[in-house]
């Protein structure tokens, strides 16, 4: 979901992106029938760090299921996610600049203290509970800090959540 610093995103997914999507799709297609059930689609989205509610999942399936069979085939899956994958809310340069703003000591990681300080500076003071929740949600490897990849994933998840309601 990375963008080439400042260049506009392409209108279509490239071959490499399609191959990655196909691999992801196949790994969640439990019975290998070429389609995803609601449960399989939910698992796939959660593996990407997203947390769709049941209503969001129902809406996604209704939107994707063009042949009305209650399942999501690969072509339907691509049609569903392609618009969000080809548009990038931030360029790589913007993401790096935002990350550097939060990573006050420049060590490549955002700690809870750095996050709290930066959010307070932005006028969004966090409670201890909010801070813990944000770190826990973004910290994929469990080391207590947020590295750049985890930061990008968190931003991407937030953008997806905003786009999908």
Curated annotation (Swiss-Prot):
Q: Which domain of life is it from?
A: Eukaryota
CDD domains for the chain: EFh
Sites where the protein binds Ca(2+) 1: 29, 31, 33, 35, 40
- Chief location of this protein? other
Q: What does this protein do?
A: Potential calcium sensor that modulates ion selectivity of NHX1.
Q: Check the record and name the PANTHER family matching this protein.
A: CALCIUM-BINDING PROTEIN 8-RELATED, EF-HAND DOMAIN-CONTAINING PROTEIN
Q: Under what name is this protein listed? A: Probable calcium-binding protein CML18
Gene this chain is encoded by: CML18
């Amino acid at each position: 979901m990375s963008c080439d610093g400042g260049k506009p995103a392409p209108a279509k997914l490239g071959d490499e992106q399609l191959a990655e999507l196909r691999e992801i799709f196949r790994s969640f297609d439990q019975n290998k029938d070429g389609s995803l059930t609601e449960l399989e689609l939910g698992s796939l989205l959660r593996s990407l760090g997203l947390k769709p509610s049941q209503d969001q999942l129902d809406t996604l399936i209704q939107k994707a299921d063009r042949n009305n069979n209650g399942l999501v085939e690969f072509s339907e899956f691509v049609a569903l996610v392609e618009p969000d994958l080809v548009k990038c809310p931030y360029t790589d340069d913007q993401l790096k600049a935002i990350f550097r703003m939060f990573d006050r000591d420049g060590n490549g990681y955002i700690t809870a203290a750095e996050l709290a300080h930066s959010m307070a500076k932005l006028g969004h003071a966090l409670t201890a509970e909010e801070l813990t929740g944000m770190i826990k949600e973004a910290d994929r490897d469990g080391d207590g800090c947020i590295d750049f990849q985890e930061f990008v994933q968190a931003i991407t998840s937030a953008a997806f959540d905003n786009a999908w309601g």
